[in-house]
Amino acid sequence: MLCGLTCSGKSTLARQLAEQGFVWLSMDQDAWDAGCREQPLPPAVQRQIKVEHKRRVRELVAAGRNVVLDYALVSRARRDEYRALAEDAGARVVLVHLNVPAVELHRRLAARNAGPRGPHQVVVALEQLDKWIATFEAPADDEGAVRVTAAELTQYPHAFAEIGEIGADRETQVNIGLGQASSPSPSQS
């Protein structure tokens, strides 16, 4: 499960995990496919996508697939809800908190808003980002999140090696453009 505000790097990481074989469940992608081009999303669209994603998480995990949930997960209650869903389906859950300072989020959002549009490049007003920043509940220590700050981004992939493999019985590599590390594959152990 990925956790972080708009422009924190969730979709970039999710894309890289998808390249390693994870099934990428993205609120942004499915909203884009439904015709939504701005944030925040209409509540009815959010509800519909969440129902479908919950069904898919249960189905995919039961089938032994690795899943990356690309959501903001802005509150503990929301994180607990999705953690319980995945664990009940048999998943080993890893929570990754992408913790980027507000000034950097603003810089990234301004650049994104000025660029081309796409599922992960929708227009978000800076004022909306400020509202999300004000209400975001960072994971507590007892949630066991792998925390990643802007200053630690070059060390970020190593966090997975410290907690073990993300993917079941296979090598997992993560490259966020600033460095790369991998957890050992069974043949390297």
Where are these regions (language model features)?
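Hydrophobic anchor at the beta1->P-loop junction of P-loop NTPases
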Residues: 2
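P-loop (Walker A) phosphate-binding loop of NTP-binding proteins
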Residues: 5
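Conserved substrate/cofactor phosphate-moiety recognition/catalytic segment
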Residues: 8-65
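Conserved beta-strand scaffold positions in the cores of enzyme catalytic domains, especially
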Residues: 22-24, 93-95, 144-148
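Conserved nucleotide-binding/hydrolysis micro-motifs of P-loop NTPases
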Residues: 29-32, 74, 99-105, 153-154
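A glycine- and Lys/Arg-enriched "phosphate-lid" helix/loop adjacent to the NTP-binding pocket
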Residues: 39, 87-137, 179
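Glycine-rich phosphate-binding loop used to anchor ATP phosphates in small-molecule kinases
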Residues: 45-98
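NTP-dependent small-molecule kinase module
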Residues: 88, 134-189
